[in-house]
Curated annotation (Swiss-Prot):
Residues 1-23 form the signal peptide. It comes from the Eukaryota. Residues 95-134 are annotated as: Disordered. Its main location: cytoplasm. Residues 123-134 have a biased composition (Basic and acidic residues). Stimulates the release of gastrin and other gastrointestinal hormones. Contributes to the perception of prurient stimuli and to the transmission of itch signals in the spinal cord that promote scratching behavior. Contributes primarily to nonhistaminergic itch sensation. In one study, shown to act in the amygdala as part of an inhibitory network which inhibits memory specifically related to learned fear. GO terms for molecular function: neuropeptide hormone activity. This is Gastrin-releasing peptide. Keywords: Amidation, Cell projection, Cleavage on pair of basic residues, Cytoplasmic vesicle, Mast cell degranulation, Secreted, Signal. InterPro entries: Bombesin (IPR000874). It comes from Bos taurus (Bovine).
């Protein structure tokens, strides 16, 4: 029985004396040299790569895209303002009748509205199902 306990006691003693943590222990004599070499740890590449930009990116290209986006937004606001103005003018001229308004160009469908060859006429099939909607 005594032969089994000795290895367990030695294992417990080694584990208690072992340093806790993920890093390998450094001897006392070399600790100062390593501390001077790697003062900021292992993150030397972080500072080295900060502020680097791609060569393909140019400020002029970014400015042109920004101007195009501003022009698109301005055109949308102008179109919305025209629609609102026509609504207000029609309301004042005709009382409460709503004028025909133009939808904003950004909400137009992506398909060709003239091409209806792919649509099937399903009207007669649904006549008897829901009479209050007919």
């Amino acid at each position: 029985m005594r032969g089994r306990e000795v290895p367990l006691v030695l294992l417990a003693l080694v584990l208690c004396l072992a340093p806790r943590g993920w890093a390998a222990p450094v001897t006392a004599g070399r600790g100062g040299a390593l501390a001077k070499m790697y003062t900021r740890g292992n993150h030397w590449a972080v500072g080295h790569l900060m502020g680097k930009k791609s060569v393909a990116e140019s400020p002029q290209l970014h400015e042109e895209e920004s101007l195009k986006e501003q022009l698109r937004e301005y055109a949308q606001w102008e179109e919305a303002t025209r629609n609102l103005l026509s609504l207000l003018q029609a309301k004042g001229a005709r009382g409460h009748q709503m004028p025909p308004w133009e939808p904003l160009s950004i909400h137009q469908p992506a398909w060709d509205s003239e091409d209806v060859s792919n649509f099937k006429d399903t009207g007669p099939q649904h006549e008897g199902r829901n009479p209050q909607l007919n």
